[in-house]
Amino acid sequence: MNMKKFVKKPLAIAVLMLASGGMVNMVHAEPTVINSKDISATKTVKEGGSFSVEFKATENEIVSGKLDADTPAFHLVMSDSGEHKGWNVRPTGASEGGQMVSADGTRVDLHTNELSWDNDHWWIDDGSERVEATFFLAAGDEVKAGEYQFTGRVEEYVE
């Protein structure tokens, strides 16, 4: 047997294996980076539903003196297509206690049949999309002439 041929074949095989292994490593090696830039973006996710509150004076006329009948003064529409359990209407400022107030400080109690009164605010457990309430002056109330204002905050709750 020729020793030169025997030694040459395994050596050639080893060289081929090393060379092909090196090629495989070169294919998986990280490329040389010539440019880079960090990236970032912001995406806003809007809250579900469409919360809306409309509060305005009713169109009927109120005449000063003792009222013969319940008389509408304000109308409130609260709506939200999102999931909720109910609503609070909290009188604020000079209207705390549930009154409309004139510039000279005259106070007249407001009432509504659509909401319940609890200590310092009106509320309703109603998860429907739209809730309306009319606030009125009670029959028998004495009302002086002037402009009256009601201030409050509407809260929507889920629990």
From Swiss-Prot:
InterPro entries linked: Fimbrial_Virulence_Factor, MyfA_PsaA
Subcellular localization(s) per the UniProt record: Fimbrium
CDD domains: PsaA_MyfA
GO cellular component entries: pilus
Cleavable signal peptide: 1-29
Main location: other
Domain of life the protein comes from: Bacteria
Record's function text: Major pilus subunit. Expressed only in pathogenic serotypes, it is part of myf, a probable virulence factor.
NCBIfam families tied to this protein: Myr_Ysa_major (NF037938)
Subunit structure: Forms a homomer composed of subunits assembled in a large structure resistant to proteases and chaotropic agents.
Protein name, as recorded: Fimbrial protein MyfA
Gene name of the record: myfA
